[in-house]
Swiss-Prot record:
Name this protein carries in UniProt: Ribonuclease Y
Lineage of origin: Bacteria, Bacillati, Bacillota, Clostridia, Eubacteriales
Subcellular localization: Cell membrane
Keyword Transport on entry: no
Gene behind the chain: rny
One cellular component (GO) term of this entry: plasma membrane
Domain of life: Bacteria
The family this protein is said to belong to: Belongs to the RNase Y family.
Length: 513
């Protein structure tokens, strides 16, 4: 057999194999298709069964939900019916109550109508009686109704005028008493709250020396050292027998302070000659200037005043070295500031302005003697120059009456200034005058005939005189009081006014046995 035959046989075998393979594949495919169809039918049947079951379940759930909703609706309907029935019962009860009230009101209205009718009948009867009485009164009195009214009105008018005058007098008296009481309370409260320290200033200062040999060195050869120091400072040096002490005498406290500082530095340094004296005096002047500024700033700090011009602060510091009747002017100004502020607070006024004016009120005393005029006017011009407000300027100028006060603060500062200055002991000369005034008051009273005892009280503002009742009668007491007032006015100098109180007392004593 040749190769071609083998090839043909192989091809035939391959074709047969392919046909057999296709047959087998087709058969398997048909079997799978049949199985798939069966599976599909099975799945469909299961799905239909599941759907039917779910449908039945959903229907059951829907029926249950519907049943629940129906039950809820029925419950709500029952509750609403019950509420409606309850409201109906309440309405019926209210209607019954209203019917009862309406019936009661009708009964009351009927009773009121009857009473009204009775009242009208009584009024008619009263009018008839009144007319009869009026006619009878006119006949008896001989006056018409209008004349009687005019007479009564005139009598009432007179009584009202008298009562009004009495009432006005009582109100005025009470108002004055209340005002005096309130003023005393305000001033007393301010004085009690203000505790300022005062040191009576003098015109001399004592410098202690380590030994008496230092006196000769201070005097110097032919007195040139002491002359140089006196010339540069304007202060007199008194060197006497007082052991280990030199007295500086001068009316200008600033110069006296410069001399004190310079002399103490010279004593410590030990080199005392004209050139060294000049150097120390210059240093002392610079120290005093620094001290002046610090004192001014301290004063503003103590009083709580801010916004002052630097020159005003410097002038305030200079007040430390100014005295008025022995009273330090800076301490006095601080005290016036506190007093004015406290009184302003008690009266319901802003204390800031009052304290500012109180601190600056004596600023005119800080300038040198080259500036002429009252210190109040000078102070107001200085305040105006350094742009203080118009109220501050006016209050400074008015605190001694040189200008008309235009604010309550100005009046308060006047009062505070008088309180600070007039306090016994605040000023040396005032203390002496105070004691002399008390003695003179009692002397004037005791000179009068019939005086038993006399007492000067209220810091010399009142003299209380006890007289002998057998010597003077009431008229004589009045005459004595007038005479004493005239004598006081002619012989004494005093601030404000003095009350003369003459007391005559008669006692009758018997004993029952």
């Amino acid at each position: 057999m040749g190769p071609t035959k083998y090839i043909i046989i192989a091809v035939v075998i391959i074709i047969i194999c392919v046909i057999l393979g296709l047959y087998v594949v087709d058969k398997k495919a048909k079997e799978k298709l049949s199985e798939a169809s069966k599976e599909a039918r099975r799945l469909k049947e299961e799905a239909e069964r599941d759907a039917e079951a779910k449908k039945k379940e959903a229907i059951l759930e829907a029926k249950e939900e519907a049943h629940k909703l129906r039950a809820e609706v029925e419950r709500e309907n029952r509750e609403r019916r019950n509420e409606v029935q309850r409201l109906e019962r309440r309405i019926i009860q209210k209607e019954e109550a209203l019917d009862k009230k309406s019936e009661a009101l009708e009964n009351k209205e009927e009773a009121l109508n009857k009473k009204q009718q009775k009242i009208e009948d009584v009024e008619t009867h009263m009018e008839e009686l009144h007319e009869k009485q009026r006619t009878e009164l006119e006949r008896i009195s001989g006056l018409t109704t209008e004349q009687a009214k005019e007479f009564l009105l005139e009598q009432v008018r007179k009584e009202v005028k008298h009562e009004t005058a009495v009432m006005i007098k009582e109100i005025e008296t009470k108002a004055k008493e209340e005002a005096d009481k309130r003023a005393r309370e305000v001033i007393t409260y301010a004085i009690q709250r203000c505790a300022a320290d005062h040191v009576a200033e003098t015109t001399v200062h004592v410098v202690n020396l380590p030994n008496d040999e230092m006196k000769g060195r201070i005097i110097g050869r032919e007195g040139r050292n002491i002359r140089t120091l006196e010339t540069l400072t304007g202060v007199d040096l008194i060197i006497d027998d007082t052991p280990e002490a030199v007295i500086l005498s001068g009316f200008d406290p600033i110069r006296r302070e410069v001399a004190r500082i310079a002399l103490e530095k010279l004593i410590v340094d030990g080199r005392i000659h004209p050139a060294r004296i000049e150097e120390m005096v210059e240093k002392a002047k610079k120290e005093v200037e620094i001290s002046i500024k610090e004192e001014g700033e301290q004063a503003t700090f103590e009083t709580g005043i801010h916004g002052l011009h630097i020159e005003l602060i410097r002038l305030l510091g200079r007040l430390k070295y100014r005295t008025s009747y022995g009273q330090n002017v800076l301490k006095h100004s601080i005290e016036v500031s506190h007093l004015a502020g406290l009184m302003a607070s008690e009266l319901g006024i802003d204390p800031t302005l009052a304290k500012r004016v109180g601190l600056l009120h004596d600023i005119g005393k800080a300038v040198d003697h080259e500036v002429e005029g009252p210190h109040a006017i000078i102070g107001s011009e200085i305040a105006k120059k350094y742009r203080e407000s118009a109220l501050v300027v006016n209050a400074i100028g008015a605190h001694h009456g040189d200008m008309e006060p235009q604010s309550l603060e100005a009046i308060l500062v006047q009062a505070a200034d008088a309180i600070s200055a007039a306090r016994p002991g605040a000023r040396r000369e005032t203390l002496e005058a105070y004691i002399k005034r008390l003695e003179k008051l009692e002397e004037i009273a005791n000179e009068c005939e019939g005086v038993e005892k006399s007492y000067a009280i209220q810091a010399g503002r009142e003299i209380r005189i006890m007289v002998k009742p057998e010597v003077l009668d009431d008229t004589g007491c009045i005459e004595m009081a007038r005479n004493i007032v005239k004598q006081i006015e002619s012989e004494l100098e005093y601030p404000g006014q003095i009350k003369v109180n003459v007391i005559r007392e008669t006692r009758a004593i018997e004993y029952a046995k």
